[in-house]
Amino acid sequence: MGGYDLRNLKKNTHTLTEGSVWKGILLFALPLLGSSLIQQLYSTVDLIFVGQLFGTKASAAIGASGLIVTCLIGFFNGMAVGTNVFAARHYGAKRFNELKRLIQTIFWTGIIGGLLLMVIGFVFSPTFLTWMGTPKSIFPLAVRYLRIYMASMISIVSYNLLSGVLRALGDSRTPLLYQFFGGIINIFADFIFLAVFHMGVEGTALATLFSQTVAAIGIMIHLYRLKEPYALRFSIKECSLREFMDILKVGIPAGVQSIIITLSNIIIQSQINTLGVTAVASFTVYFRVELIVYLPIIALGQAVVSFVGQNYGAGNWNRIKKGNKFSILGGSVITFAACMLLIIVMPVILKAFTKDTAVAAQTLEIVKVTFPFYFFYTVLECFSSNLRGFGKAFLPMVVTVVSFCGFRIAALFVLMAQNPSPDKVALSYPISWGIAAIAMAVLYVRNRSGEKAL
């Protein structure tokens, strides 16, 4: 155990290897959900300020960078899964010397990786936006916004990776607190830079840079003040190539999966665009209200990764089995019940998003097509997270990419071949969820780490 005082370990972190399984997973997932909601708040507040104060062109300039930003953040959220898995495993197994080296490795991975992205982004922002077909009327604004935004990459990458460490140690509340604090600063900075100094899209990017930097520094200070062995000491000499390769083994497949799925959504959006303005507006609203279901499922999956990682390290096979059953069966039942309730109250919810009755009616029809089958996504996410918790990320990536990019797009074109409609676009989603859930279940049974884990 490396001679470390376990009382300090208990004092500073939370363990998922003891106590009630279902309560531990749910209480751990709630702060993760809060963090996701605050991240959504960042972009929403930016668009509100820019749209109200600087008009359509400024909003479009930010939107033009949206896919690039989504891909980058999605990739490093995937990398954070890698940090989560191995930090949780070391923590659960009480391999404290390895945990210490891993944390230093994660820190310098974030700093160096973020710096490389910042330089690449600054130099190649015009090239990226050209590839995206950005309209000439907003091109200069989009370049200025993206270049300043890319300056925040060190902070964004470091925050995501170090938050993965804290989640692995069983602490999902601290990242939430710093995310919340960063969100408040983002709103305040938006007001100062946009309403007071009238800085336009540059002000929005600076607000993001400022708030993300504060959140990242907060996480670093928090880790620095912890007791050994999981304190951050900024020591590059303690970095480990082996730990770095372990992070990449899980993190890169998860990150690549996020990017490919994001890119596949361009094809789906192109089909939606052929259905007219009302359909485009309806799906825009749908993708907003869908977050009510989607974000809790993602939070549950993140909690499962930490839960499995810690218990795998500790050798608690029976506890993993119980957590697996609760997350999949309990999560599916809760998802189905929540979706049925949401369908009933959806007409009221939609009034907050649109005043157009045609858009509201079409959005409701889309919800009725997808929500009854959303439990498939819970099954998919939980099986996938279980496998990642075991350190197996490549095959889940293959299943998800083939299902979401292959079967979904194939189903979309088959359904749209005759009498295309928004309902048929919507139907391609549950088809791909069902295929992916079944394939992931088979994959889990065939690739589980021993009979005890099932």
Regions found by a protein language model. Name each.
Residues M1-A29, A87-S152, V196-I252, V308-F373, ...:
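Short alpha-helical transmembrane segments in multi-pass integral membrane proteins
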Residues E18, W22-L41, V45, I68-F75, ...:
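Residue-level signal for short hydrophobic patches within transmembrane helices
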Residues L27-D46, I148, Y159, G182, ...:
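Transmembrane helical elements of multi-pass membrane transporters/channels
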Residues L41-A60, L129-K136, I192-M199, I259-I292, ...:
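Helix-terminus/linker motif at the lipid-water interface of multi-pass membrane proteins
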Residues T56-L67, L146, A205, V277-I292, ...:
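Small-residue hotspots at the loop-to-helix junctions and early N-terminal turns
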Residues S59-V119, I156-P175, S282-M346, Y377-T400:
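Small-residue-rich hydrophobic transmembrane alpha-helices
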Residues C71-G74, N186-D190, A216-M220, I292-L295, ...:
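Hydrophobic transmembrane alpha-helices of multi-pass small-molecule transporters
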Residues A80, I148-R167, P175-G183, T204-I219, ...:
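Short runs within selected transmembrane alpha-helices of multi-pass transporters and secretion channels
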